[in-house]
């Protein structure tokens, strides 16, 4: 056992979002450790970021040298660990030259946070997605079209000549969470499950006419109470209604456009359908 050399991180990549803290501990091209923790910006105070980072990766830090930590996402917001000012579009996604240094207490780490992107008219911002976009463009250097990044706040991003030229954000994921977990609908909606046919019907229904969306949402509760709708069916319709509303609003981004969808498998599949 004494002959085995312990592997330490060469550097650590972090995506610190609104809802989750994702990290990858890297040695060359090898991932030593990866995890997703429900410790997003919504749940943390400014002085808690370093504590949770060290708790997650501390045993893989070389005590004899400084390990670079590169962070994107909401850790760089005004309410995050340390603010990294936005770059204005049109712009190429930020790279290491734009990363802002962060003061840390632990002497084993050198922390930098990448800035997000801002759009003046209409006003919009992104943090974290711009780094995902950079990864896409590094692998698809001639990509011109639209990138859809589903999530808590879904982004529709138009790319031309390697630059982000405009984008639009929809709070679809957060609205689904609030309605299914914090509203009167929480008693009528399951925690999981999916009915593809109902989802497609619900999406098309709202794309065609969304004037009565508020009423249709309460219909979910009424139909459940009257035993005409299961919790799984209710969850599916709620998701379909909200994604349908988003697709109706984002039509200029996807209609007749080349679209690349980047996100977790389950939610990306919903958008692809």
Tell where the protein language model's regions lie, with residue ranges:
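Phosphate/pyrophosphate-binding loops at sites that engage ATP/ADP/AMP, CoA/4′-phosphopantetheine
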Residues: 53-68, 247-255
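Short glycine-rich phosphate-binding loop at a beta-alpha junction
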Residues: 65-77, 151, 243, 256-265
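A short acidic Gly-Thr/Ser loop motif
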Residues: 14-20, 74, 148-153, 172, ...
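Short acidic-glycine loop/turn motifs at beta-strand connectors
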Residues: 26-30, 107, 158-163
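Glycine-rich phosphate-binding loop plus the immediately following alpha-helix
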Residues: 42-44, 117-209
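Short beta-strand-loop/turn "lid" adjacent to the catalytic site in phosphate-handling enzymes
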Residues: 62-126
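ATP-binding/phosphotransfer module of carbohydrate and carboxylate kinases, centering on a glycine-rich
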Residues: 21, 26, 184-273
